[in-house]
């Protein structure tokens, strides 16, 4: 196992807390218009917020990552960094910095999470001497240089499973290739069927992570017993078999900017049949994935674009530019390989 702690920007307002005392002494927290430090409530209770628009505050945050690196953490997960607060939205007129200039929360809100992710990345890079691994909830244009992202607090609902495919494809086309969702849903209670279909549907999402909120049904696969546990294990093993393939696609993305998960219209833009399709996706140019995203469904129609396609599970070949009906029992993800594809295995 590797440990990746969640770190929120909200610093506990506590005169005995070293980080708080340092930040107050150096004037590193965002302020009210009258110059006093702005306070709101988040997970530690009363909390203050680093002014990440200033380079010296980013460096201070980065230096405080050393403790986590020294204790053996494998990465850092930045959360609640819109910034979020428990007692209403942060007012627009709270003073945030934009470099050397004073500005407002209204103007700087969208880049707050970006600057936090950048600071976290630089801290890990400086002290771990390894390729940093950061996850962030809030992001902005360019954050992909510093962090992976996920789509936030979704729900254990079938429409949210359906939403996953266009969300991740759109992120990929926006430069955020390394992205994922909370598999199984974060809020509400997942069912065995929903969790199984979600772990199948997300098989090729770059960030592949089951996550659930406190107070909801536990979502570890063994909680649901069989056959959920065996199916879950099957797809985790399959995921590991595809890691070299996904790694190659990650490298290619750094060169050509094309995402790993892609809408079919990106690869087949002249095909009218795929222009509004949201329940299938491509993995690079080589794989076509057609997940089951409807409750109780054991078959589904799959549209195959131009070319020759091979059923991953049984080797049957199909000509493209047509729709086929495939069997999709609970343990099967409809998956097709483009003919003449070489997959590192």
Q: Could you say what each language-model-derived stretch is?
A:
Residues 1-343:
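Catalytic-domain carbohydrate-binding cleft regions of carbohydrate-active enzymes
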């Amino acid at each position: 196992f590797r440990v990746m702690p969640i770190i929120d920007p909200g610093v506990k307002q506590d005169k005995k807390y070293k980080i708080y005392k340092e930040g107050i002494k150096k004037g590193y927290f965002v302020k009210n218009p009258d110059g006093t430090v702005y306070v709101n409530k988040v997970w530690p209770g009363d909390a203050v917020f680093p002014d990440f628009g200033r380079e010296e505050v980013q460096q201070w945050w980065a230096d405080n990552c050393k403790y986590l690196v020294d204790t053996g953490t494998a990465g850092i997960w930045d959360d609640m960094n819109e910034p979020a607060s428990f007692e209403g939205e942060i007012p627009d007129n709270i003073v945030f910095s934009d470099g050397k200039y004073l500005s407002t929360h209204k103007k700087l809100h969208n880049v707050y999470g970006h600057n936090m992710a950048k600071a976290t990345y630089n801290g890990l890079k400086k002290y771990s001497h390894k390729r940093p691994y950061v996850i962030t909830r809030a992001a902005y244009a360019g954050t992909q240089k510093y962090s992976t992202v996920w789509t936030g607090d979704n729900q254990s609902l079938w429409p949210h499973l359906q939403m996953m495919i266009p969300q991740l494809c759109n992120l990929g086309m926006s430069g955020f290739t390394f992205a994922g969702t909370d598999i199984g849903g974060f809020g509400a209670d997942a069912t065995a069927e929903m969790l199984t279909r979600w772990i199948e549907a997300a098989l090729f999402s770059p960030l592949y992570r089951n996550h659930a909120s406190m107070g909801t049904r536990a979502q570890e696969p063994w909680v649901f017993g069989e056959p959920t546990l065996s199916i879950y294990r099957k797809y985790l093993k399959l995921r590991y078999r595809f890691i070299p393939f996904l790694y190659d696609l990650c490298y290619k993305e750094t060169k050509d900017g094309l995402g790993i998960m892609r809408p079919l219209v990106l690869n087949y833009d002249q095909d009218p049949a795929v222009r509004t399709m949201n329940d299938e996706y491509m993995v690079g140019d080589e794989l076509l994935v057609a997940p089951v995203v409807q409750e109780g469904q054991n078959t589904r129609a799959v549209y195959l674009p131009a070319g020759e396609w091979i059923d991953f599970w049984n080797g049957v070949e199909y000509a493209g530019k047509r729709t086929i009906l495939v069997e999709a029992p609970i343990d099967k993800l409809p998956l097709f390989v483009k003919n003449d594809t070489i997959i590192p295995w």
